[in-house]
């Protein structure tokens, strides 16, 4: 699985549709966060930028998948390639729509929000203030942002005000 993902990450792409089909056949075999997170699209950010519409369309169904690592795949690919101003609103909307309760999905969403914050702090902070995420994921995103060395002390203090109470499980 890992090797397959690594091979796909280095694949010489001559046909976008064929390549995305190969990736789609691999995605169901993802069984851990490490296999998921090691993958990147062949050609990296430059390739994705050249095929942004196709790649975004390819990822969209995975955001609403039922399987943990299919959702995590969409979120991790999103944070790698779409956590930027030009795609911020649709990416954050996809993150807010995720209702899957698995730890690895929730952590990926928190990580993605933190990554969005580093690239677009004002817009992401305003989005966080809308409380669109479940409380645990919302607070974990704030924690991850505050742990970053790229965020100044004043912003870290402001973010504390956005934390929400989380119900303890019985």
Regions flagged by a language model, labelled:
Residues 1-170:
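Alpha-helical scaffold domains
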């Amino acid at each position: 699985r890992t090797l397959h993902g690594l091979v796909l990450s280095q694949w010489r792409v001559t046909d976008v549709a064929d390549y995305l089909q190969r990736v789609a056949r691999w995605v169901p075999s993802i069984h851990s966060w490490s296999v998921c997170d090691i993958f990147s699209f062949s050609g990296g950010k430059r390739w994705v930028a050249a095929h942004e519409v196709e790649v975004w369309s390819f990822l969209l169904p995975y955001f609403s998948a039922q399987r943990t690592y299919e959702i995590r795949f969409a979120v991790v690919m999103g944070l790698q390639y779409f956590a930027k101003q030009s795609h911020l609103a649709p990416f954050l909307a996809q993150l807010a729509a995720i209702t899957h309760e698995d730890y690895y999905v929730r952590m990926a969403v928190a990580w993605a929000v933190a990554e969005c914050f580093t690239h677009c702090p004002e817009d992401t902070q305003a989005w966080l203030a809308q409380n669109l995420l479940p409380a645990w994921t919302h607070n974990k995103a704030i924690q991850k942002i505050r742990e970053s060395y790229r965020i100044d002390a004043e912003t870290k203090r402001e973010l504390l005000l956005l934390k929400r109470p989380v119900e303890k499980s019985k």
